[in-house]
């Protein structure tokens, strides 16, 4: 028995070493990464074709909190969750203002492995950076200026969104005026404790998605001590019907002008759905490599290996489409950490099948893979 256990441990160790080496081979090299950092919004075809009609304004709200409670861990808003939605809104004819509870320059979380073309373009966009650095204090935001509110994710939102008086007022006023309320990941914390003029809770009997308990506790096992609450639990306690998708994959809910996304992989669809709720068909864009991989992984989770394999082969046959293999590999690592060995082997098969599919980081509409730290 001891011999069998030793052999099993050795095999697992070899698999782990091999997986790490494989992952490292997928990460873009220094030259590619440096070129990516020079991305400009003016070079992205999707943005070159932006709607010129003035369709109104959207207020994006980010956290002002830079520390996770008493844990001492730094936090802020997620840059990718702001940048990608920002450009979808701009491309579709909306001016975007940026606000935060305290105003001024908010704390930001930037992970180099997460960053893609749109994200670096945002960092290099003088107009966008001026709005971010001088974010509007929420007390100065006028609800009548905006057709929609968008609450950006980031763990800091768990601390300064839920009981913020200005947020409650803005959300209630914009919603009751017929506007759209959008949020992603930890952003839906802003929708807690919001009451309408008739005394009902905004979220009562509404379908809502956010970062799930499962996702939170996998990343931060002591999340119940780090955060004042678990977001999924609080949304359910608020009377919402919580809609959870597979872990770390796209899931959006759209109910009565409230559009919410589960995690960072839901930003693109959440932003497009917000445009639809505002009464417009979103401007077409080439789907990113990351989104394609999310679709493959969702097909695997919901319909099995066969469907995922078929979709992957279809994507490989289309010249404009690319696949983010690193994201598939990361899900394989999660499966290994959960000791789901059959799932791990099947995801490895998908990686092998992907063959010459590549991580497209330098194309004008592709996004580099992100880690699981949301």
Ranges and model annotations:
Residues 179:
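Glycine-centered, small-residue-biased loops immediately flanking beta-strands
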Residues 185:
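Catalytic, metal-anchored helix/loop core of enzyme active sites in primary metabolism
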Residues 2-176, 190-209, 214-374:
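Extended, subdomain-level signal for the structured scaffold at the beginning of enzyme domains
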């Amino acid at each position: 028995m001891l011999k069998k256990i030793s052999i099993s441990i050795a095999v697992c160790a070899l698999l782990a070493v091999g997986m790490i080496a494989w992952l490292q081979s997928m990460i873009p090299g220094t030259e590619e990464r440096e070129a990516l950092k020079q991305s400009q919004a003016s070079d992205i075809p999707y943005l070159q074709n932006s709607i010129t009609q003035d369709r109104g304004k959207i207020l994006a709200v980010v956290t002002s909190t830079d520390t996770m409670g008493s844990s001492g861990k730094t936090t802020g808003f997620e840059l990718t969750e702001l940048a990608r939605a920002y450009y979808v809104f701009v491309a579709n004819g909306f001016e975007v203002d940026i606000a935060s509870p305290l105003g001024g320059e908010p704390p930001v979380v930037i992970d180099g492995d997460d960053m893609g073309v749109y994200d670096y373009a945002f960092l290099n966009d003088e107009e966008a950076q001026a709005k971010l650095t001088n974010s509007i204090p929420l007390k100065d935001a006028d609800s009548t200026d905006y057709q929609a509110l968008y609450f950006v994710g980031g763990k800091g939102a768990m601390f300064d969104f839920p009981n913020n008086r200005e947020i409650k007022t803005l959300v209630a006023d914009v919603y009751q005026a017929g506007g759209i309320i959008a949020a992603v990941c930890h952003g839906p914390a802003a929708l807690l404790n919001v009451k309408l003029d008739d005394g009902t809770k905004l979220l009562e009997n509404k379908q809502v998605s956010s970062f799930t308990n499962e996702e939170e506790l996998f990343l931060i096992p002591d999340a119940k001590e780090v955060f004042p609450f678990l977001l999924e639990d609080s949304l359910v306690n608020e009377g919402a019907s919580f809609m959870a998708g597979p872990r770390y994959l796209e899931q959006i809910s759209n109910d009565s002008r409230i559009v919410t996304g589960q995690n960072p992989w839901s930003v693109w669809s959440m932003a497009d759905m917000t445009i639809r709720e505002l009464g417009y068909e979103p401007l077409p864009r080439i789907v990113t490599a990351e989104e394609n991989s999310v679709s493959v992984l969702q097909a695997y989770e919901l319909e099995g290996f066969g469907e995922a394999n078929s979709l992957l082969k279809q994507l490989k046959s289309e010249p404009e489409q690319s696949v983010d293999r690193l994201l598939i590999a990361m899900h394989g690592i999660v499966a290994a950490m959960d000791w789901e060995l059959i799932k791990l082997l099947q995801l490895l098969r998908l990686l092998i099948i992907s063959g010459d599919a590549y991580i497209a980081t330098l194309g004008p509409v592709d996004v580099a893979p992100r880690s699981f730290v949301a």
